[in-house]
């Protein structure tokens, strides 16, 4: 029975000494896992490219924001990349392939931080709008049908975000979250772009004198 309470005993001292989050300016860095579904449905020189699936990718970026509890306002810049696993040409799957899907997004986000049972833990929800610059490179490496197809495009983008922040010091916090980004239908890709991210981030708050 005593062992059952051991995790709680270990957590309580940590949360007791953790800090209440403060209002003011902050900046942060984040990185994580990217899952990019198929986002190409395009005909090029009588060849249709579809079903471009990708290997596990990554996301990295930074942000600058202002917290006015319970809201946060933030500008964000991020880069993501995932290599191509396979794609189809004229509905025939191609497995001997190369290529990638990458992009840069600049977003303006707004968050709502929920006060938790423990003051240092804050679940959050967020929404952002901005612009994304995207590139898809599809290379068929089979010798008798070798092709290279590249798409470059940019579009309005929006995203939803959710996660939890742990304020382990008055000026520092870490957060773990999920985000989903999407664009409207893009002519160059023949469909919408969308991606899922699992993200770990760290933030530094500049103004250590302005408490909630």
Residue ranges and their predicted role:
Residues 23-25, 56-60, 100-106, 121, ...:
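Residues that define the transmembrane beta-barrel architecture of outer-membrane proteins
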Residues 1-23, 207-212:
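Cleavable N-terminal export/targeting peptides
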Residues 27-31, 62-64, 73-77, 110, ...:
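Membrane-embedded beta-strands that build the outer-membrane beta-barrel scaffold
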Residues 78, 82-88, 160, 165-212:
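Predominantly the C-terminal beta-signal and adjacent terminal strand-loop region
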Residues 17-65, 201-209:
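Short glycine/proline- and aromatic-enriched beta-strand/turn motifs that initiate or cap beta-hairpins
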Residues 19, 65-139, 198-208:
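Gram-negative (and chloroplast) outer-membrane scaffold detector with strong preference
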Residues 38-52, 78-103, 131-156, 185-191:
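Flexible, solvent-exposed loop segments that connect beta-strands
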